[in-house]
């Protein structure tokens, strides 16, 4: 069983080592972690997803007995709460339309028990888009990327190629000028339809298989 753990602890040397040591001693394997320091600089927030912990009560006792721990909570993992993610990047107007289609379709599947979330980044400029696409590889739980705009090519195309090679994340592109549509898995003319298809491509309760339409323009 995989669980989510949220910890607020003192921001000082050795704290993270101590906390992960407790998890290791209890047979826990950390599958995902994220940390950041709060604005005051004195407290750090640590989120971890852990599998293999059999004695939850002992975990609570060990964590709460640490002087460096200010708060500790066990909950469902983000994978279970938010599920797979549709990432939509590009020009604001096109991103909004794709998101509208994706959210409507995600609602249908989430009602049936799935968990699909939709993330958007309205952004323009080749360098900005290049960095955004490359960064998708570092995001957790990404199921598919949709690129929405009227012109994308150059470094953005290289970033798409690299993303697909490294992660295998499928990419849908709106019909646009530039070379990005040539390297996308699917090109869609209607932004609303692109959003719907993006969700269907990663939904377990849908029968759409993006691999069967690779390279097509809809």
Curated annotation (Swiss-Prot):
Residue span, ACT domain: 4-83
Classification via PROSITE patterns: ACT
Coiled-coil annotated residue ranges, if any: none
One Pfam short name: DUF5612
Protein name: Uncharacterized protein MJ1458
Organism annotation: Methanocaldococcus jannaschii (strain ATCC 43067 / DSM 2661 / JAL-1 / JCM 10045 / NBRC 100440)
